[in-house]
Amino acid sequence: MAQQDTDQQHTGVLPVDDDGFVIDAEDCEEREAAYRERGTSRPITVVGNPVLHKECKDVTDFGAELEQLVADMFASQRTAEGVGLAANQIGVDLKVFVYDCQDDEGTRHVGVVCNPKLVDLPADRRRLDDSNEGCLSVPTAYAPLARPDYAEVTGQDEKGNPIKVRGTGYFARCLQHETDHLYGYLYIDRLSKRERKDALRQMAENEPRYPVVAND
């Protein structure tokens, strides 16, 4: 795997492999801690909060405010024991998500994506996996949901540089799930009416294990 040439590197930017995808599986513990330790954990918004049900605004300012938001998101994700978190899940109307997730080989990936877009893959690369899926914004509820077991996302890093991220297995599910969030979709929106009702019942019958924002 080749890193970017020195003159193409920017402070805090991940190197890329020969196919142009970020190398997000190196120094994960150190990078996650560096983000998280600068941040403040915030409560999680839950289904019914308007910020979760509309498309978020594009990130256009890649300065100190975004840097602090990303740090807060990593701190919030750790508190909630999640593997991915979108900005609207802590009440911020911006297209950015963070992740700390393993792929189907158990390899850990850590990173940030702003203004993400899922790449439309050809049919022969869309093998579906119908594993259980959950969401911090639908606490304690799980349901099987078929999604492709490979995903590619394009976007920008927290410095505004173009990036490409790819994942397999659970990490592929995470990339799709978090991108959905930023366009106003929860995973339960992709379920049948019966399955959605059951997920909401699970949520109503159990207490979340992390702080949440109460809906009015």
From Swiss-Prot:
Gene Ontology molecular-function annotations: metal ion binding; peptide deformylase activity
HAMAP family: Pep_deformylase
Needed co-factor(s): Fe(2+)
Residue positions of the active site: E178
Keyword Iron found: yes
Cofactor: how and how many bound: Binds 1 Fe(2+) ion.
UniProt keywords, alphabetically: Hydrolase, Iron, Metal-binding, Protein biosynthesis
SUPFAM superfamilies: Peptide deformylase
One GO BP: translation
Ligand binding (Fe cation): C135, H177, H181
Function: Removes the formyl group from the N-terminal Met of newly synthesized proteins. Requires at least a dipeptide for an efficient rate of reaction. N-terminal L-methionine is a prerequisite for activity but the enzyme has broad specificity at other positions.
EC number of the protein: 3.5.1.88
Name the record gives this protein: Peptide deformylase 1
CDD domains with a match to the protein in the record: Pep_deformylase
InterPro entries per the UniProt record, alphabetical: Peptide_deformylase, Peptide_deformylase_sf
PANTHER family the record matches: PEPTIDE DEFORMYLASE, PEPTIDE DEFORMYLASE, MITOCHONDRIAL
Family: Belongs to the polypeptide deformylase family.
Annotated gene: def1
Catalytically driven reaction(s): N-terminal N-formyl-L-methionyl-[peptide] + H2O = N-terminal L-methionyl-[peptide] + formate
